[in-house]
Amino acid sequence: MGKLDVIQAKGTERLKRGFAKMVKGGVIMDVTNAEQARIAEEAGAVSVMALHRVPADIRKAGGVARMAPIEKIQEIMDAVTIPVMAKVRIGHVAEAKILEALGVDMIDESEVLTPSDPFFHIDKREFTVPFVCGARNLGEAVRRIWEGAAMIRTKGEAGTGNIVEAVRHVRLVAEGIRQIQAMTDDQVYAVAEKFAEPYLRLSLNVKEIAGLPQRVLDNEPIYGHYTYREIVDGLYKILLEIKKLGRLPVVNFAAGGVATPADAALMMQMGMDGVFVGSGIFKSSNPPKMAKAIVEAVNHWDEPDVLVEISKEIGEPMRGQDIEELEVRLEERGV
């Protein structure tokens, strides 16, 4: 491939998904400074996520959680040789443009930060940098993929050290895929129509305020320049690909609540392509040992005897939270 071809290929769906595949089978760790980034790299992380605070501290601090300071992200980028990701608020196109210009390797449009748009996620096809997005179920995953996400992750419930919501989301997506595979193409199209409904909310809201009929025409733009029927057809195409593959067509990581090597191994046993670890590393009593143990657990997830040794002398994991006691459920953000 010549230089011109490389330039023309930049930002294509194939290139974006190719980057995501490079981190497949690995661990991506949240870090808040250069020292933590170096600990993650030395432990074997395939990438780091640059944040101002880890999710547990974001949850504790309250208020509005935004993109990390540029100086902080740059400090982390300068400290390591592995890819650096950073988070933006759901729907915040300007934050994403800034991170793209800064040169991060991937952007996470994340429910961990305070959403900026109550109606839509970013149209990720408008960017050259690849995106990862969270999903609780097949509908959310397919919508994010149609919008251009190169990687999907479970939302879980970030900052809790509780794996239960990540398990829930893995099972919901897997069962959705199983049911799609049993459907006729006409039934799959009906599912695509159902999955497209969240894009109608803004248009229907405005019509309701104006006293107009609660109806959207097939040729009426409802998400950027995309019409309802174009969105349905796009979702249908992705669902047919899922039906054929028996899995999502992009890399699918676990995230939200991973706090121990056993949690990481469980996610891999459930069919995940890799693991994000947020608060679980640097809220543990021995971050370097916990980081290395979680990386090794992902590498040896199907070897119980090895997992026994990995789980020894790693210190105390982060203190977990009961999901039912939470005042704010981050996983419910987004559509």
From Swiss-Prot:
Sequence positions that bind D-ribose 5-phosphate: D30, G159, G257, G278, S279
Record EC number: 4.3.3.6
Claim: Lyase is one of the keywords in the record: yes
Enzyme category, top tier: lyase
Full protein name: Pyridoxal 5'-phosphate synthase subunit PdxS
Keywords linked to the UniProt accession: Lyase, Pyridoxal phosphate, Schiff base
Reaction catalyzed: aldehydo-D-ribose 5-phosphate + D-glyceraldehyde 3-phosphate + L-glutamine = pyridoxal 5'-phosphate + L-glutamate + phosphate + 3 H2O + H(+)
Organism annotation: Thermococcus kodakarensis (strain ATCC BAA-918 / JCM 12380 / KOD1)
One Pfam match: SOR_SNZ
Origin: domain of life: Archaea
Family membership: Belongs to the PdxS/SNZ family.
